[in-house]
């Protein structure tokens, strides 16, 4: 089943109590309504490359928090040797809900809410799209300057306390984060930078190859078919997103955005709860491959 924000946060507390030597609580920022953006750090040894997992920045995309909590649970409890290896050779920062106000609002008021909940002066419409609010090619492509739209980018870059505080937290880990994974739904896509231009990144070919391998791994279990590509070409131009900012500003070489199940459908944000576990399983399969392939290509060599 899908869980509320208090349920997710109390589960994180429980993990800290149950695994005190490997799990520590982390606050990644705060929200307009004063909630914490809470996550955990999972670490089994010193000096590991860091994998940053950001999820549910769009409030209605509930499968993302469900999938990242599934991943977190696997890292701590799985007996599978491949997953143990992945858990213990990387440091994981996992933030299941990076838009807590919006997430709560989707449970109490409007299941289809996407944005933050901050008021917009001069408008009756509330909220900014937090994945169009980051200070990297802000307001250039696939975003709107009208507050009543779903993709409103905000009155300025980092106008939202959520994106501002979370980006400040990420900056404290600059140089340590080697992999950035952002989770969205839906469309079954695995996307990499950039969203503001069709120009390829310096490691475009690697990101395409790693992504293709990850999509093959993901498909093995249930035949779920993912398309891989840079945002601009694979989905649509969209600038001001967290992944592009993290990739560019923090020099994180391996950066992907997942668009989880389903592929399409009129109610794609309301994925039936009986698909949570399968989505989690196949997604973990693909994350294993992203890390394995990135390592094989030399991205985690400590000498750089």
From Swiss-Prot:
Disulfide bond residue pairs: 125-148
* Keyword set, alphabetical order: Carboxypeptidase, Disulfide bond, Hydrolase, Metal-binding, Metalloprotease, Protease, Secreted, Zinc
The record ties this protein, via PROSITE patterns, to: CARBOXYPEPT_ZN_1 (PS00132), CARBOXYPEPT_ZN_2 (PS00133), PEPTIDASE_M14 (PS52035)
One GO cellular component assignment for this chain's record is: extracellular space
Q: State the protein's purpose.
A: Involved in the digestion of the blood meal.
Q: What is this enzyme's EC?
A: 3.4.17.-
Positions in coiled-coil regions: none
Positions that bind Zn(2+): 58, 61, 184
Q: Start and end of every Peptidase M14 domain?
A: 1-294
Tissue expression summary: Gut specific.
The protein's name: Zinc carboxypeptidase
Induction (record text):
By blood meal.
């Amino acid at each position: 089943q899908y869980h509320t924000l208090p349920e997710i946060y109390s589960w994180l507390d429980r993990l800290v109590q149950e695994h005190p030597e490997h799990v520590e609580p982390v606050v990644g920022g705060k929200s307009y309504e004063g909630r914490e953006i809470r996550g955990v750090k999972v670490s089994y040894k010193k000096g590991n490359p860091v994998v940053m997992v950001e999820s549910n920045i769009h409030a209605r995309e509930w499968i993302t928090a469900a999938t990242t909590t599934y991943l977190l649970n696997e890292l701590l409890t799985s007996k599978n040797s491949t997953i143990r290896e992945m858990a213990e050779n990387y440091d994981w920062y996992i933030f299941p809900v990076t838009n807590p106000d919006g997430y709560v609002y989707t449970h109490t008021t409007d299941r289809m809410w996407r944005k933050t909940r901050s008021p917009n002066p001069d408008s009756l419409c509330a909220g900014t799209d937090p994945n169009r609010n980051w200070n990297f090619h802000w307001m250039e492509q696939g975003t709107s300057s009208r507050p009543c739209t779903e993709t409103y980018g905000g009155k300025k870059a980092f106008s939202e306390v959520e994106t501002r505080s979370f980006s400040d937290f990420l900056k404290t880990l600059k140089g340590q984060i080697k992999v950035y994974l952002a989770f969205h739904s839906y469309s079954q896509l695995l996307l990499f930078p950039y969203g503001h231009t069709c120009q390829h990144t310096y490691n475009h070919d690697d990101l395409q190859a790693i992504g293709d391998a990850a999509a093959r791994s993901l498909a093995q279990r249930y035949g779920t078919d993912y398309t891989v590509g840079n945002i601009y070409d694979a989905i649509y131009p969209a600038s001001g997103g967290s992944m592009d900012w993290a990739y560019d500003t923090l020099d994180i070489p391996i950066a992907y955005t997942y668009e989880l199940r389903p592929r399409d459908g009129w109610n794609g944000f309301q994925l039936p709860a009986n698909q949570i576990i399968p989505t989690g399983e196949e997604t973990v399969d693909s994350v294993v491959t992203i890390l394995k392939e990135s390592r094989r290509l030399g991205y985690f060599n400590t000498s750089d």
